Amino acid sequence: MDVRRRSEEAVYSSKVFAADEKPLKPHKQQQEEDNTLLIDASDALPLPLYFTNGLFFTMFFSVMYFLLSRWREKIRNSTPLHVVTLSELGAIVSLIASVIYLLGFFGIGFVQTFVARGNNDSWDEEDENDEQFILEEDSRRGPCAAATTLGCAVPTPPAKHIAPIVPQQPAVSIAEKPAPLVTPAASEEDEEIIKSVVQGKIPSYSLESKLGDCKRAASIRKEVLQRITGKSLEGLPLDGFNYESILGQCCEMTIGYVQIPVGIAGPLLLNGREYSVPMATTEGCLVASTNRGCKAIYASGGATSILLRDGMTRAPCVRFGTAKRAAELKFFVEDPINFETLANVFNQSSRFARLQRIQCAIAGKNLHMRFVCSTGDAMGMNMVSKGVQNVLDYLQNEYADMDVIGISANFCSDKKPAAVNWIEGRGKSVVCEAIITEEVVKKVLKTEVAALVELNMLKNLTGSALAGALGGFNAHASNIVSAVYIATGQDPAQNIESSHCITMMEAVNDGKDLHISVTMPSIEVGTVGGGTQLASQSACLNLLGVKGANREAPGSNARLLATIVAGSVLAGELSLMSAISAGQLVNSHMKYNRSTKDVTKASS
């Protein structure tokens, strides 16, 4: 069905007629008015329509069954077929009556519909042109925004004020009355769709599938939202984004996109290679501070980063009738003899998935199984979930009394601070270290080695312990992790466990130089899938040299990205701790992170 076709009510309301002039109606509607005087087949009995139909349907099949039975009996007894009893005669009459009714109700009406449609399928001249235009628009594959380039320019009605639908509010004075919401005029067909969505006739979520144009759907949805809420979305951009690229994988119900500035910190000298680290943030001074840390590391000979573990996790929960049965499955899963079988079942989910181990925990008659597997260059949540489902299906055959409560039961643990991630790790576990010379500490960081060591002990260790921190033994690791994650298309919500970090500082070389390290047990990153395929994020990954999958060594791009994240955190920790030690934190934030500019004017 063409959702953009204008309703009859809209057609009538779109024209202004003179006092003595009647609006033209489609002949189909006029025919319906004329047919009100005709007698239909359903008027055969003074009964409701469904009773009449049911009666004649029952009569038809009952009589047909009776006549067929009698016919078969006559053939079996060699009775002449033309010899008809009174009951058979009544059955024949009933059959003819039911056939006439059913043909009159269904067949003739169906034929009349096509005959009437062939003779009267026309509107008045203006409406026919409008309908033809809409049908031509439906066959066009290009978006409306590109109409001028495709040679199908659409006439646009003059711009006008569109009054938003807002709740009735008490009257206010002229001085307090807000300015009316002004939006660009939509085309006539878009206007009809907007009205249908506002009225609830068309679901907003179905616009992409009905229109076949993601950008146009976002534009219409944005206008609908403005009219319903009465709030302007003028500052939310719509153009300049490929909405087709996010359909079905990144975002639903789109109305635009937000703009986050991206800065560059570096070069970061890590494992003998230089990296320019993209950081998407709205916090002033963050990129500048991280950049200063990179400068200090570079001047001191660079940093070293080591990958300790690489394994994404998923932990389903199953329930048995007794705790004994749950323990039996625990012993079965943890038995090394059975691991190879379970691994083969798990690894069938993907050519990159490789099961590493299964860690079990019992809570009464419930068993939580934490699956750990490598996932190549993908972050791997979907991959490991598919593998877990395969294993659960296999175990269901062996343990018929096993009840699967959920494929994810928080023993993973995803997007939550958890001791299991802090201790066992999740994703990539990385440690990064550097030795900062005394000269660099004084000239670049403007502080002393002893002051940094003391501050780290009292702030990152003692202070965090007093606060009951879980994985938060650092200054601001999440700042750097979030900024790099947004820039490179990672899942920002996984910043929670990815920012687990303990920062250590120690004076070395007779107290002259500073040894600094960050240990991050659960960095969850990928270079394929999710937001990594978006143009901006893909460009940032390309800048780091980790775009896409590594065909020669699967998984190496994601592991390299994890080490870069850890190296960036090291730079950020070094610079912020130095600023606090030197008493520069407040001054720098007042200079770079506090502005008196009118941002609304700048954006307009």
Swiss-Prot record:
It comes from the Eukaryota. One of its GO terms (cellular component) is endoplasmic reticulum membrane. Residues 189-604 are annotated as: Catalytic. Pfam families: HMG-CoA_red. InterPro entries: HMG_CoA_Rdtase, HMG_CoA_Rdtase_cat_sf, HMG_CoA_Rdtase_CS, HMG_CoA_Rdtase_eu_arc, HMG_CoA_Rdtase_N, HMG_CoA_Rdtase_NAD(P)-bd_sf, HMG_CoA_Rdtase_sub-bd_dom_sf. The chain crosses the membrane at residues 47-67, 91-111. Its main location: endoplasmic reticulum. Disulfide bonds: none annotated. It is a multi-pass membrane protein. Its EC number is 1.1.1.34. It is an enzyme of class 1 (oxidoreductase). The keyword Membrane applies. One of its GO terms (molecular function) is hydroxymethylglutaryl-CoA reductase (NADPH) activity. It is found in: Endoplasmic reticulum membrane. Keywords: Endoplasmic reticulum, Glycoprotein, Isoprene biosynthesis, Membrane, NADP, Oxidoreductase, Transmembrane, Transmembrane helix. The active site is at 283 (charge relay system), 415 (charge relay system), 491 (charge relay system), 589 (proton donor). The keyword Transmembrane applies. Glycans are attached at residues 120, 347, 460, 593. Residues 112-188 are annotated as: Linker. GO terms for biological process: coenzyme A metabolic process; isoprenoid biosynthetic process. Pathway: Metabolic intermediate biosynthesis; (R)-mevalonate biosynthesis; (R)-mevalonate from acetyl-CoA: step 3/3. Belongs to the HMG-CoA reductase family. Catalyzes the synthesis of mevalonate. The specific precursor of all isoprenoid compounds present in plants. PANTHER family: 3-HYDROXY-3-METHYLGLUTARYL-COENZYME A REDUCTASE. This is 3-hydroxy-3-methylglutaryl-coenzyme A reductase 2. The lineage of its organism: Eukaryota, Viridiplantae, Streptophyta, Embryophyta, Tracheophyta. The gene is HMGR2.
